[in-house]
Regions:
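N-terminal capping/lid subdomain adjacent to the active-site entrance of alpha/beta enzymes
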Residues: 1-173, 178-187, 191-195
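Catalytic core of soluble alpha/beta enzymes
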Residues: 149-258
Length: 258
């Protein structure tokens, strides 16, 4: 065995408390995976998500369970049959990509046969707070091209968006309910959000309880997040509504694995 896998926990304080509909946090707990092969070292990290039943301990155990196979040469393709989509597989998969890039001198995007790298516009997220606090945060980030606004369904969401729109009138806006609304809230807010220039609503209803959206009006484009956790989710999503866009996050193998 020439390869060796290690994993360690790191905690990074956030600049402030970050709130969504499910809770709040003031730090990010990550697991860092390193795969050593001779002088080469590939590394990656992941964030376990309680929403999917993950903890730091459970994800660490998943990673260490495949450590012997990785040491014996387990590759990215075979990894998909050894770990389910999730934080653990994401970290090991990305570490293997990084290791191969360093060993061959070929960037990961070349290995993946992506035609070319082009700049992409991403969103800047504002966590849930009072309308006044979110408006101040929006004003401080008014030059960013797209602001994503976390929502809760607590009755103050429309006030939050109105205050943000007034503070950052040039910014494009999307909102993310993180499963925090019900159908009545969606039907009430969607047309009003459209009037405020909101271009997309992400995951308004809970995953597994979003069928009512299939026949609901669409004044704003909808985006699936928690309802589209892996590739197996796509057929059901398409069957519900061909106009719903799946979201892609930075942890690709946790979202689009088999």
């Amino acid at each position: 065995m020439t390869r060796r896998l290690t994993v360690r926990a790191e905690t990074w304080p956030l600049a402030g408390v970050f709130r969504i509909s499910r809770g709040a946090r003031s730090e990010a707990e990550v697991l860092v995976v390193e795969i050593h092969d001779g002088a080469a070292r590939g590394w990656a990290e992941c964030v376990p998500y309680a929403r999917y039943g993950e903890t730091m301990d459970s994800v660490r155990a998943q990673i260490m369970a495949v450590a012997p196979a990785v040491a014996n040469g387990l590759g990215r393709t075979a990894l998909a049959t050894n770990l389910p989509p999730g934080a653990a597989r994401n970290a090991v998969d990305c570490a293997l990509w990084d290791l191969a890039a360093k060993q061959t001198g070929t960037a990961a995007w070349h290995q993946a046969e992506i035609a070319a790298l082009v700049p992409l516009t991403t969103v800047f997220t504002l966590g849930v707070d009072t309308p006044e606090a979110m408006a101040a945060a929006a004003a401080a980030n008014a030059t960013r091209p797209i602001l994503k606004l976390k929502m809760t369904g607590d009755g103050a969401d429309i006030d939050r968006v109105a205050a943000i729109h007034a503070s950052a009138p040039a910014a494009r806006l999307v909102v993310d309910a993180n499963e925090g609304w019900d159908l009545a809230t969606y039907l009430d807010l969607a047309p009003r959000l459209a009037e405020l220039g909101v271009e997309m609503i992400e995951q308004p209803l809970p995953a597994g309880a979003d069928d009512p959206l299939a026949g609901a009006p669409r004044p704003v484009t909808l985006c699936a997040d928690e309802s589209c956790h892996d590739r197996a989710s796509l057929p059901g999503l398409a069957a519900k509504d061909s106009e719903t866009a799946p979201k892609s996050s930075i942890q690709p193998s946790s979202l689009l694995g088999p």
